[in-house]
């Protein structure tokens, strides 16, 4: 009987620690501008003018290290502002992480669906990065033997995506792993088909997914570029299938077809690592992930009119987040799992490290159940 898997993770507190957001006043912003006008103008989607006045009167704003409570305080060029957002309850999120592999340079975690990797949007504390800080940063023996106080993720998985997440424990490991990921993307851009299909590259990534509809071909190669469009609720823009986008390469293998439920269980190997690549590529070929709240056939978002995008609808950068009316990339509901990763041992590149994350039942074939 094999021992139970090692896990890390501490329960989330009811409230997070709040956040501090810093601004520096330029000469153009300082001309007859009050502190309330500055925040309302720059962060309109965070709160109306009255809301900013209340925050100022509540003592949540500092100018050059001093708390100000007068909303009509004039700003000067060069002033340093700090807005302290009060602690709040973040949405419910899993916290336990299974350790799949660990050596002196690398730790591979099995990320559960629903847990965000890095802070952003509604999730500022409830992230994988926070758990790494808590679980390793407080370990005196770890701190004493490492260049970094805790491991750091070297790539991202979507919040709704589960499976293997690689985290570097040293600066050298972070550099090497980042180079492996970058190499895969550069090979796609070079048009080298042999290497795109798996020959000669250092990092291999295989996913398991449940696609809507029946994929009739046993193997499908997708080379649809992925670009960015403006989209409400996504400050940096939304990734979609776009002829003007950057090269992306995915290879899809059908494992099982369920004609009764009208879905296909597929294995997907990706060479590049564009954000949401598998979701976009499967949707582009007419088979979006089952339960995907965002992407539909064609690799585009549901019910989206780019002419109606309003900048004020984006998440506020200061933390006063509003839930958008339309689906955003972090929404869950789909079934996508980073199942296998192969890469060279970082100390001995002649050895290959193969990491496998156990499959969720819904992504197992009949023989695997």
From Swiss-Prot:
**Mind listing the GO biological process terms from this record?**
pseudouridine synthesis
Q: Which SUPFAM superfamilies does the annotation name?
A: Pseudouridine synthase (SSF55120)
| Enzyme class, first EC level, given as a word | isomerase
Q: Which domain of life is it from?
A: Eukaryota
What EC designation does it have? 5.4.99.-
Q: Reaction catalysed by this chain?
A: a uridine in RNA = a pseudouridine in RNA
Q: What is this protein called?
A: RNA pseudouridine synthase 5
